[in-house]
A protein has these predicted regions:
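Helix C-cap/helix->beta junction micro-motif
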Residues: 20, 130, 185-186
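Short catalytic/ligand-binding loop motif for oxyanion handling, primarily in non-cytosolic enzymes
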Residues: 34-38, 166-169, 198-199, 229-232
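Proline-centered loop/turn at the N-terminus of a beta-strand
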Residues: 24, 112, 133, 156, ...
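Conserved core of the PLP fold type I
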Residues: 56-181, 197-212
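Conserved core segment of the aminotransferase class I/II
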Residues: 212-275
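N-terminal small-domain helix-loop-helix segment of the aminotransferase-like
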Residues: 2-94, 102
Length: 275
């Protein structure tokens, strides 16, 4: 019956501030940006606006999967980090949050979901709303806030957020390999939230789950421009669904493409140019 956590916190803060205007509130709810968009982003968006105002360069409906120029740019980013992706494996979204919830449309409601605790509340709320069984993996001081696979637990869908929201703990490539091996052995799919990957600076820590062997057969990766470029209000992200990933013998890439073309009209051209 409660609303979404960050929405509830925002309403409570607003009510308190209205009743106590003299109080200085330290906001511990959703993490928002504090700096404006970069000049290069603003210039690209301004140019895109001008294009839409001219008959020769006007654009209507865009491709649901995203414009080629952005998908190919993301493809190049992964290539520079040693990860080869096909452009058709990249789906442009209006942010990681949307896709983290919407991706569940391609999975059955009788799937068991494994979620680390504590973690980003979207994972829990979307599955509670769908009626799925949830199993929690404790992230605590004893395990460095990085729970590892438990062979006694069977799950169909596994959420991993690294670096983690809210703890900041990040998995090494070696630790992620253990999760990939577990998922492949159990026929599970990993939903890997890489929204905070730009903050990884220590050697040995993974920025992408595709740095591990076999991940393309069991993992979907979600990324966001909110943390890398301050797009919390502009809204843009992307999701990688490998062609090699199959769940119960069915291509997740094809299922997600069908879902997106049916329920999503794509991210605005102006925003994608900025991204």
């Amino acid at each position: 019956e409660e609303s979404y956590l960050f929405s509830t916190v925002a309403h409570k803060v607003s009510a308190f501030s209205a009743a106590h205007p003299e109080a200085k509130v330290l906001r511990m709810g959703i993490g928002d940006v504090t700096l404006p968009l970069a000049p290069a982003v603003v210039a690209a968006m301004q140019k895109a606006v001008s294009e839409l105002g001219k008959k020769e360069t006007f654009r209507g409906y865009g491709p649901e999967q995203g414009y080629d120029f952005l998908r190919e740019s993301i493809q190049g980013y992964y290539a520079r980090h040693g990860i080869a992706l096909d452009a058709n494996e990249i789906f442009i979204s209006d942010g990681a949050k949307s896709d983290l919830g919407n991706i569940l449309d391609i999975f059955d409601t009788d799937n068991t979901v494994l979620i680390p605790d504590p973690v980003y509340p979207v994972y829990v709320d979307t599955n509670v709303m769908a009626g799925r069984k949830i199993v929690f993996a404790d992230a605590n001081a004893e395990n460095g806030f990085l729970p590892m696979p438990d062979e006694s637990v069977n799950a169909d869908i596994i959420y991993i957020c690294s670096p983690n929201n809210p703890t900041g703990a990040a998995y090494s490539a070696e630790q992620l390999q253990a999760w990939v091996d577990y998922a492949r052995a159990h026929g599970a799919v990993i939903l890997y939230d890489a929204a905070y990957k730009c903050f990884v600076s220590e050697k040995g820590l993974a920025r992408s789950i595709y740095e591990t062997k076999g991940a393309k057969e069991c993992a979907i990766e979600f990324c966001s421009f909110s943390k890398t470029a301050g797009f919390t209000g502009t809204r843009c992200g992307y999701t990688v669904v490998p062609n090699d990933l199959k769940f119960d013998g069915i291509s997740c890439n094809k299922l997600w493409l069908r879902r997106q073309t049916t329920k999503f009209n794509g991210v605005p051209y102006i925003v994608q140019r900025g991204a």
